[in-house]
Amino acid sequence: MKKGIHPNYVEITATCSCGNVIKTHSTVGHDLNLDVCGKCHPFFTGKQRVVDTGGRVERFNKRFSIPGSK
């Protein structure tokens, strides 16, 4: 590798709003504040929910289904 052309690769801490602290390496050069992480994101905690806005799926299926196909 050439000398003097690569950015500094330093250890930083990424702090989540839930209080989780993650130590990692980055070229950013300063600590990061995160909104969500793997400990508090709904997908990873199992609290994710599927929202069907006003029966849109049923409305679509009713409109574009082929009569007599069921």
From Swiss-Prot:
The keyword Transferase does not apply. Pfam families: Ribosomal_L31. SUPFAM superfamilies: L28p-like. One of its GO terms (biological process) is translation. Coiled coil: none annotated. GO terms for cellular component: ribonucleoprotein complex; ribosome. Its cofactor is Zn(2+). GO terms for molecular function: metal ion binding; rRNA binding; structural constituent of ribosome. Keywords: Metal-binding, Ribonucleoprotein, Ribosomal protein, RNA-binding, rRNA-binding, Zinc. Zn(2+) binds at residues 16, 18, 37, 40. Binds 1 zinc ion per subunit. HAMAP family: Ribosomal_bL31_1 (MF_00501). Binds the 23S rRNA. Part of the 50S ribosomal subunit. Belongs to the bacterial ribosomal protein bL31 family. Type A subfamily. This is Large ribosomal subunit protein bL31. The gene is rpmE.
